[in-house]
């Protein structure tokens, strides 16, 4: 699933190409793509006609396009969603779900989604911040993110540090890949109890999270297959810089110990057994 760097890369591309453009027509080619829009596909298309995109913003892994009407288009890429800018004459993609045509002669915006886990909706009055995503915490790259608030909230939790990093109500945008990479840099195992971490240790980890996310944004994100691309259909390159994620049994880039792969929340965690030893005290299992 796209994480913050991938979604931010898409946001930057959209901001360059759709800001201040007026929507002339919207075609919904698959109703599942707008299933989160309760009023239905026809209403989705109708309410967007003749509106102008004012900006492109992001909260965690969600995008929204504020409109001059005061509403907003909210989007989530899911597992395979793509927002592509294409010339109007370009052939339709096999999994094209929604098409936005603009009043000028510039490229059209297409929502393509093979697995249809992603989707678009209109948030009434949501231009500043859609209510649908208001519960999601700010991300570590957000200028208004509070380090002190995060440290205090994290240390009150009785959970494992990796679970906390993936909790979108604590901080947003961090997924499995970048959590593993930040924990490796911080020399912390993902099962380390949060209530045992000192404030300075949490701040050091937060610094590594920011570094990993920032570096990944510069590389256009991480692409493991053809499903993640930017608005021009290009893949990201951060996978070449990964230190542990996806490198099971390969030598740790820091100490040479083979990287360990472990099951975690129906996915996999990657860590170095030497640099990131398991904690002696585990978080008690919930009853």
UniProtKB/Swiss-Prot annotation:
Its cofactor is:
Zn(2+)
Q: Please name the GO terms of the biological process aspect recorded for this protein, alphabetically.
A: base-excision repair
For this UniProt record, give its keywords in alphabetical order, as a comma-separated list.
DNA damage, DNA repair, DNA-binding, Glycosidase, Hydrolase, Lyase, Metal-binding, Multifunctional enzyme, Zinc, Zinc-finger
Q: Where does DNA bind?
A: 95, 115, 157
Active site annotation, chain numbering: 2-3, 61, 267
Q: Where are the zinc fingers (FPG-type)?
A: 243-277
What EC number(s) has UniProt assigned to this enzyme? 3.2.2.23, 4.2.99.18
Q: Which domain of life is it from?
A: Bacteria
Cofactor remark from the record:
Binds 1 zinc ion per subunit.
Show the GO MF annotations: 8-oxo-7,8-dihydroguanine DNA N-glycosylase activity; class I DNA-(apurinic or apyrimidinic site) endonuclease activity; damaged DNA binding; zinc ion binding
Its UniProt entry gives the catalysed reaction(s) as: Hydrolysis of DNA containing ring-opened 7-methylguanine residues, releasing 2,6-diamino-4-hydroxy-5-(N-methyl)formamidopyrimidine; 2'-deoxyribonucleotide-(2'-deoxyribose 5'-phosphate)-2'-deoxyribonucleotide-DNA = a 3'-end 2'-deoxyribonucleotide-(2,3-dehydro-2,3-deoxyribose 5'-phosphate)-DNA + a 5'-end 5'-phospho-2'-deoxyribonucleoside-DNA + H(+)
Q: Which residues form the signal peptide?
A: none
Matching entries from SMART domains are given as: Fapy_DNA_glyco, H2TH
Q: What does this protein's UniProt record list under function? A: Involved in base excision repair of DNA damaged by oxidation or by mutagenic agents. Acts as a DNA glycosylase that recognizes and removes damaged bases. Has a preference for oxidized purines, such as 7,8-dihydro-8-oxoguanine (8-oxoG). Has AP (apurinic/apyrimidinic) lyase activity and introduces nicks in the DNA strand. Cleaves the DNA backbone by beta-delta elimination to generate a single-strand break at the site of the removed base with both 3'- and 5'-phosphates.
Q: What family is this?
A: Belongs to the FPG family.
Under the subunit heading, UniProt states: Monomer.
* Record PANTHER family: FORMAMIDOPYRIMIDINE-DNA GLYCOSYLASE
Name of this chain's protein: Formamidopyrimidine-DNA glycosylase
């Amino acid at each position: 699933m796209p994480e913050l760097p991938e979604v931010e890369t898409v946001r930057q591309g959209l901001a360059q190409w759709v800001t201040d453009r007026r929507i002339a027509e919207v075609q919904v080619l698959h109703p599942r793509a707008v299933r989160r829009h309760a009023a239905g596909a026809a209403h989705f298309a109708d309410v967007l006609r003749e509106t102008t995109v004012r900006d492109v913003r992001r909260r965690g892994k969600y995008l929204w396009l504020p409109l001059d009407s005061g509403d907003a288009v909210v989007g989530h890429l899911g597992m395979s969603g793509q927002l592509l800018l294409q010339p109007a004459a370009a052939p339709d993609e096999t999994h094209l779900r929604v098409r936005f045509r603009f009043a000028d002669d510039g490229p059209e915006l297409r929502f393509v989604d093979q697995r249809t886990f992603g989707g678009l909706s209109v948030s009434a009055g949501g231009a500043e911040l859609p209510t649908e995503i208001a519960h999601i915490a700010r991300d570590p790259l957000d200028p208004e993110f509070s380090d002190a608030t995060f440290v205090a909230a994290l240390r009150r939790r009785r959970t494992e540090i990796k679970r906390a990093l993936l909790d979108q109500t604590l901080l947003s945008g961090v997924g499995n890949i970048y959590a593993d990479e930040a924990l490796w840099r911080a020399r912390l195992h993902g099962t380390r109890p949060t209530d045992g971490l000192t404030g300075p240790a949490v701040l050091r980890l937060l610094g590594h999270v920011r570094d990993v996310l920032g570096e990944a944004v510069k590389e256009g994100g991480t692409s493991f297959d053809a499903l993640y691309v930017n608005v021009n259909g290009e893949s990201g390159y951060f996978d070449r810089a990964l230190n542990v994620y996806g490198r099971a049994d390969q030598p740790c880039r820091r100490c040479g110990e083979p990287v360990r792969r472990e099951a975690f929340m129906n996915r996999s965690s990657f860590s170095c057994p030497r640099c990131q030893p398991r904690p002696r005290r585990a978080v008690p299992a919930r009853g």
